[in-house]
């Protein structure tokens, strides 16, 4: 603490360089987070979900860490299988991939970790060959990425959803136009076995030439049908703008089948509307959408017909400042929350302002983020944390999981070590 006070004096009197100032404020942020300890969310805002917001605690844990200059773990998301862990606890399955940092978005096949004691212990990351790369005769590698796992109670299976991706033999993505599709894989907990990943067949190969459900939260309805947010572009479309929709699908425990899709939401601003995430709250469906310039939201009564999209803004009228990255939902029985990154948090040194991770309550009628409820869930340590997941684990816990993407290299002295974090929100 004494050294921090000395540093504060040096900040005030201009004796520190820019990098030292950045590190100083990160130290302050981390200490503030630790001292806060238990994060509480309460407000008397009369518009806040028409009820008092729930108190909650946040327990921040490191699941695993890895950084060797070649890869870090990324796209870490977790799903809960009820009742088959120790003493009736759920079994947690975390899916993640290696990001080979020499290339942009260059990911391994899928790995999984497992916990039967609510995260007290985890198995080591296990490569799953059925979820790995497939090598074609033309030296092209086809993989799957941006996976979100979830439990399908009617069939007793875990379903992992994402999309396909193409890589060069020597590394890196193939950027020329190729068909992309929603990919899925099935885990049978009784056999402790993954089936080989498959691709969802769409009704129009031309229209949905470049489509997928990357990084999105999806829903299982009471009748077992799935609502899967997806984004797409037609073949030969050079607009650099995706459209988003919600796919209505059936699942028999082995095969995922398209049935219909809702309104197609478009926006003629690079790169359109993509990486949508879906949730349901009090019988209404909420969709948050990524755009390069700002984030958008819309609502529906049937997941087919949607209100006009609107930018995400705080209840004070200012835009929340989330851009060119995803947002996700956290749902309490009495309250709807948004998890996001944003600019304006002393984080200009982070590409796309992709850290820290914030959570705040949402007014579900006005579609506003309640600024006074905003909290930092996972502090930033100089690197990006954009590819995160939010999962309902039990009625009492929701988890936000993310791996530190060790980029940019000039910030690697600011505390990041390739940790995969789990922020346990305890309601």
Residue positions per predicted region:
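Low-complexity, intrinsically disordered segments with a bias for serine/threonine
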Residues: 7, 33-36, 46
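Charged/polar low-complexity intrinsically disordered segments
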Residues: 20-22, 27, 118
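Bacterial N-terminal signal peptides
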Residues: 24-37
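Beta-rich carbohydrate-recognition and catalytic domains
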Residues: 42-72, 80-142, 151-211, 219-275, ...
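Short glycine/proline-rich, acidic loop/turn segments that cap or connect secondary-structure elements
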Residues: 390-394
């Amino acid at each position: 603490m004494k050294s921090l006070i000395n540093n504060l004096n040096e900040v005030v009197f201009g004796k520190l360089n820019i990098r030292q100032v950045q590190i100083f404020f990160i130290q302050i942020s981390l200490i503030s987070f630790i001292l806060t300890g238990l994060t509480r969310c309460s407000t008397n805002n009369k518009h806040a979900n028409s009820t008092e917001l729930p108190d909650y605690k946040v327990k921040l844990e490191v699941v695993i860490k890895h950084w060797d200059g070649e890869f870090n773990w990324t796209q870490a998301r977790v799903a809960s299988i009820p009742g088959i862990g120790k003493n009736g606890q759920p079994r947690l399955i975390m899916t993640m991939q290696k990001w080979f940092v020499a290339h942009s978005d260059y990911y391994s096949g899928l790995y999984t970790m497992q916990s039967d004691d609510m995260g007290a212990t985890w198995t080591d990351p296990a490569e799953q060959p059925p979820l790995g790369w497939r090598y074609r005769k033309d030296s092209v590698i086809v993989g799957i990425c941006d996976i979100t796992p979830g439990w399908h109670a009617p069939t007793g299976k875990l379903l992992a959803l994402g999309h396909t991706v193409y890589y060069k033999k020597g590394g890196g993505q193939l950027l020329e136009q190729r068909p992309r599709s929603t990919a899925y894989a099935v885990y049978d907990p009784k056999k402790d076995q993954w089936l080989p990943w498959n691709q969802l067949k769409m009704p129009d190969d031309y229209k949905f030439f470049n489509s997928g459900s990357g990084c999105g939260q999806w829903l299982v309805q009471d009748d077992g049908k799935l609502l899967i947010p997806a984004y797409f572009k037609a073949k030969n479309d050079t607009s650099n703008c995706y459209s988003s929709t919600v796919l209505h699908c059936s699942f028999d425990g082995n095969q995922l089948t398209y049935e219909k899709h809702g309104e197609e939401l478009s926006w003629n601003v690079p790169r359109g509307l993509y990486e949508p995430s879906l949730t349901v709250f009090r019988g209404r469906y909420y969709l948050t959408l990524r755009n390069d310039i700002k984030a958008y939201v819309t609502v529906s009564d049937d997941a087919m017909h949607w209100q006009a999209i609107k930018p995400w803004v705080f209840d004070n009228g200012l835009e929340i400042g989330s851009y060119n990255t995803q947002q996700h939902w956290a749902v309490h029985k009495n309250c709807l929350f948004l998890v996001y990154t944003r600019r304006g948090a002393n984080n200009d040194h982070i590409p796309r302002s992709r850290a820290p991770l914030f959570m705040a309550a949402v007014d579900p009628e006005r579609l506003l983020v309640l600024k006074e409820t905003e909290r930092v869930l996972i502090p930033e340590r100089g690197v990006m944390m954009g590819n995160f997941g939010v999962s309902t684990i039990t009625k009492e816990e929701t988890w936000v999981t993310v791996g530190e993407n060790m980029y940019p290299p000039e910030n690697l002295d600011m505390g990041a070590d390739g940790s995969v974090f789990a922020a346990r929100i305890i309601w």
